[in-house]
């Protein structure tokens, strides 16, 4: 069992586009550990790369984490004792510390131009040199001395001076003792005065009291650099937990360029339940609570969470498994609760305008409440409910009869339709049971037609398709007048063919 002193964890995304699903993946384990230990979970915005900032990205980060139930205890939005929580608002914090590193001999200014660095890389590649890092041309030089040599630029960057005896091993909460490759002289302050990730993350984590750093395994190679910065600045280093990377089904790293599911907003747009996605992300790196028991709420997960149980294998992000899990969550919801979730989704996504060509009316909402039990068992996503129920919300005269469904009706469909209309006209009790009993008696018992063939024309007439939610319950919801109007309209249509 890992030490349970109150931990301070953080997730630190960059607002450079749609939030990545990896942000939620890390935030899940950050929040779980903070909650498990009675600590705090912090959201920090790392916006030092000014060239890649995207408008609205920061707001989307707040919205998606809130939607997932992973809201932080401290953030730029809610504040906290360690404000500001945006790196761009902390620039005055970094520069004095960079100067301190220069004065102590742990860092140096570099005036090499981008052209010179590119040439260095090309020459090494041509010579098949194993060297990949900076060649320290500027080390020990003044600006005036460096200006006399080729490839000079007026505004310098600042680089770490990595010692020969740098310790490459460190302890990881998930992986035990880890050995990383030797780092090069990393830039820690850019020419524009902004710190790089490596400098800013160390400074911010220390000053915000972050004692448990949860991040992807791609940062293992950077950890020796970060530990050096902690050492040089005289600070205690945090504990590190390097999570396994999310992988596509072909085992490649999941990315927004190749996989739409890498976009965190995509799950909300598609109609996934946040609790299902959260549960799914948990299962990617943590064992189930019991054999065959995949569904687990967040509080239960928190109560048994320990870093020693996190998997180190590359979890495969298989949306098919998420679809199954989301369907399980949908079917676990009470029909009234599910209806509210469906309507909230439809309102947020303006779905009715795409499905019906208009907004939902109050009458529509009442119909959806009544009809939700008919489709609950058939749903995988919230987005599927409205299209499945659209026939109940369509004007009788506007219902479109699917051509393929009409074409597949067997001979005698017109006779079935005539008989069904006459039976339904005489019904006073228009409940689902009464409708079924009357139609079965006339079409199956008297006319000798098999139920599947007998009810197919009725289904097409009422719903527009051969595939629909339960027919008789749908007819009850439509009511006698609307049902007969549709059936008579369809009767007239097939009479013309």
Curated annotation (Swiss-Prot):
Going by the UniProt record, its keywords in alphabetical order are:
Aminoacyl-tRNA synthetase, ATP-binding, Cytoplasm, Ligase, Nucleotide-binding, Protein biosynthesis
Where is this protein localized, as stated in its record? Cytoplasm
Q: In which residues is ATP bound?
A: 256
Q: Example GO biological process term?
A: glutamyl-tRNA aminoacylation
Q: Does the record carry Protein biosynthesis as a key word?
A: yes
A GO molecular-function descriptor: zinc ion binding
> Where is this protein chiefly located?
cytoplasm
- UniProt motif 'HIGH' region: location: 13-23
Keyword Secreted on entry:
no
Report the GO terms under cellular component. Answer: cytosol
Return the PROSITE patterns for the record: AA_TRNA_LIGASE_I (PS00178)
Entry EC no(s) = 6.1.1.17
Similarity comment = Belongs to the class-I aminoacyl-tRNA synthetase family. Glutamate--tRNA ligase type 1 subfamily.
Quaternary assembly: Monomer.
Q: What is this protein called?
A: Glutamate--tRNA ligase
What organism is listed for this UniProt entry? Cutibacterium acnes (strain DSM 16379 / KPA171202) (Propionibacterium acnes)
